[in-house]
């Protein structure tokens, strides 16, 4: 029985109790939000070492880290290092997007290594296997896709992205609304290509009940993918994006009524002035289900720095109600991220999540900032390092800048404002 079905029956699960303790909420409040579909707890019954996380309304903003192999770069040990680094940096979830090598082996290793929820996009494995076998993705057999979904669920995958909103209905009008970057979602483009070449409906949409049955069996949370998300500022909030969102809104309630936990994915590339509208529209159309956003990136001109453009957009989106931020690394649009890129991406989006929690009135976030300010006033460096989002980097920079032997730092030295005011006897200026 899924977390959602148990919540609807009034049962408080161990996972709900863990989430309640972390969020400083009552278990009953968490149960109620899960029952309403406003909070999800991705927790596959087969993920043995999982520390459950709650995602959704009224909870702290969570951050996901994408990783995985590609056909060009396939080093298993690197991906496992990324898992460790991402979790250490504060990632609340991991997605394995591998497309190269032994996909079953790497996924199982990641699940075994990860104490946080693990997500996948099953279509990637089905497409990769089809391409390797036939050299033509259009020959993908829907039965293979569902076999992959069942296998991944049995392995312990906690949430799955499925692009069920990309349908033949939308395909009919696709070319009526031209875009600068067309379709940038891998899952969306694969689905469109398959439907066009086979003249058939998206199998995940056509057999949605079959998909739900698998999810219900293992308590896999569905993440309804945004296959038509805008891939450029010029395409943000266009007709295709909204058409897909409306379809996803229909499927949210249907899935929830079948006892399956569900969240909804969102854009993409969105200018700052459109972020509030995007979040509120999604929440309205999708019954306040948890909203999972990729950034969003607020400008297109920063390759090499897109963890920053994503953090800016993520802070805004989360402030207006987004619940789950997918990180973006400095390597976005350029190549597969390194271990160092993963750490940078997680920390950038953790800063965004914390900034949003702070603005949303989260007492724990406010207390942490307050304590940091007190430590700075007291020139208490050890306490500052403890409270820092990346203690190791803060400590290293202080040492490298020649500050470790002085009470203040090498920026101001004896002219340190804090030092001067402290020597004044604690009076307020």
Swiss-Prot record:
Binds 1 [4Fe-4S] cluster per subunit. The cluster is coordinated with 3 cysteines and an exchangeable S-adenosyl-L-methionine. Its EC number is 4.1.99.17. GO terms for biological process: thiamine biosynthetic process; thiamine diphosphate biosynthetic process. Keywords: 4Fe-4S, Iron, Iron-sulfur, Lyase, Metal-binding, S-adenosyl-L-methionine, Thiamine biosynthesis, Zinc. InterPro entries: ThiC, ThiC/Bza_core_dom, ThiC/BzaA/B. [4Fe-4S] cluster binds at residues 409, 412, 416. Pathway: Cofactor biosynthesis; thiamine diphosphate biosynthesis. It catalyses: 5-amino-1-(5-phospho-beta-D-ribosyl)imidazole + S-adenosyl-L-methionine = 4-amino-2-methyl-5-(phosphooxymethyl)pyrimidine + CO + 5'-deoxyadenosine + formate + L-methionine + 3 H(+). Zn(2+) binds at residues 269, 333. It comes from the Bacteria. It is an enzyme of class 4 (lyase). Substrate binds at residues 66, 95, 124, 163, 185-187, 226-229, 265, 292. Its cofactor is [4Fe-4S] cluster. Pfam families: ThiC_Rad_SAM. GO terms for cellular component: cytosol. GO terms for molecular function: 4 iron, 4 sulfur cluster binding; carbon-carbon lyase activity; zinc ion binding. Belongs to the ThiC family. Catalyzes the synthesis of the hydroxymethylpyrimidine phosphate (HMP-P) moiety of thiamine from aminoimidazole ribotide (AIR) in a radical S-adenosyl-L-methionine (SAM)-dependent reaction. This is Phosphomethylpyrimidine synthase.
